[in-house]
Amino acid sequence: MVYRPTFRKQGDGSRCAWQNCGPASQAMASQRFREGKDPLNHHGWPPMPSEIRNAISPNSCGGTTLQELDAGALLLYNTNMWVRYGVPWATFQSLIISGRGAVVQILYSVVHGTKFDGSPGFYGNHGIYVNERRVSDGAYLVYDPLCDHRRSYIPQGPQWWPAALLRRAAEAMPGTAPGCVNASFTVDTE
């Protein structure tokens, strides 16, 4: 069975909360990377978005890159992610099937209006965590840090997203090569 990390929302009341989709996704990826085992260092456990944010940018807010997230998580939790840009969809799919999780960059306008929409009215760049792929229908278990059920019409993550939706959202991310995904992968934990 694939290890499933604790869901982390980005709107947690901490500094930069509503800009912490990347740190929240990385927190979940770091917990998966270590399969829930505390590295027994002087940093908190389990991983939290605010701690990753403070390691990356202690005095400012804003978007984060996959490299920044990796550097913060490596410092805090000794989780060295495999950061890749322009990963062909078939390669992404095979890496998830093989037992890796991934922080994935998406364009949220693709998700808008679906039952997976965690922030109606938000259309920008976003970070999510993908934990696994279901064999029966090819859906992906997505931990969207916006899906925290803060209102009755906001879903609670994680959710099983259809592969077509995940692919469209990832391929629509500005700067992504056609047919490709920008992602940061955990080690194979299976």
Predicted regions and their residues:
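Short regulatory "switch" loops immediately downstream of catalytic or recognition motifs
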Residues: 31-38, 107-114, 147-148, 169-170
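Structured segments of extracytoplasmic/periplasmic soluble domains
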Residues: 24-36, 72-79, 95-98
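Extracytoplasmic/secreted proteins, especially bacterial periplasmic and envelope-associated proteins
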Residues: 20, 24-28, 64, 68-72, ...
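Active-site-adjacent substructure of cysteine-protease-like catalytic cores
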Residues: 87-143, 151
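Active-site-adjacent structural segments surrounding the nucleophilic cysteine of cysteine proteases
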Residues: 1-63, 118, 135-137, 189
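Mid-length scaffold segments of soluble, non-membrane domains
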Residues: 62-86
